[in-house]
Design a protein with these regions (language model features):
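Short, surface-exposed charged micro-motifs
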Residues: 89-91
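Active-site beta-strand-loop-beta-strand hairpin of nuclease catalytic cores
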Residues: 93-102
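Basic, Lys/Arg-enriched alpha-helical interface segments
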Residues: 1-87, 109-126
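Acidic/polar active-site rim loop that often engages polyanionic ligands
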Residues: 103-109
Length: 126
């Protein structure tokens, strides 16, 4: 089944622009849906704070390759934040130092993103 989606601008920074996938049948973008799953005060607060700190750093310095954990096949650009050990992963596609497209993410529930239920939106893109 093909899902219809758009890519919307989330934030503009001098060094990088953040975009997010937005499935047509959903009210929120995938990035917004990620943060909705982990409200302030939840069990994963520390992990969310780590991801936010990385987003701030990337916003300031750009989407440099060294800031990402590569999760996909060679050359597909699928990456995750944070690069360090964490219970959560926020998945994205790094197109360049200046363009970052976020998908969704969640609790690290398997060894490979292709096996994760939370990453189906990335796997099913046409």
């Amino acid at each position: 089944m093909t899902q219809l989606y758009s890519i919307e601008l989330i934030e503009e920074h001098e060094a990088v622009n953040f975009y997010s996938l937005h499935l047509d049948e959903k009210e929120l973008s995938e990035l917004e849906r990620f943060f909705e799953k982990f409200p302030e005060g939840c069990y994963f607060d520390e992990d969310v704070d780590t991801i936010i700190a990385w987003l701030d750093r990337i916003g300031e310095l750009g989407a440099l390759e060294r800031y990402f954990r590569y999760e996909g096949r060679y050359g597909d650009g699928v990456s995750a934040i944070p690069i360090e050990t964490s219970n959560l992963r926020l998945y994205c596609i790094r197109l360049s130092d200046k363009i970052l497209v976020f998908g969704n993410g969640g609790v690290k529930d398997c060894a490979r993103w292709q096996e994760s239920e939370t990453c189906l939106v990335l796997k099913n893109l046409d």
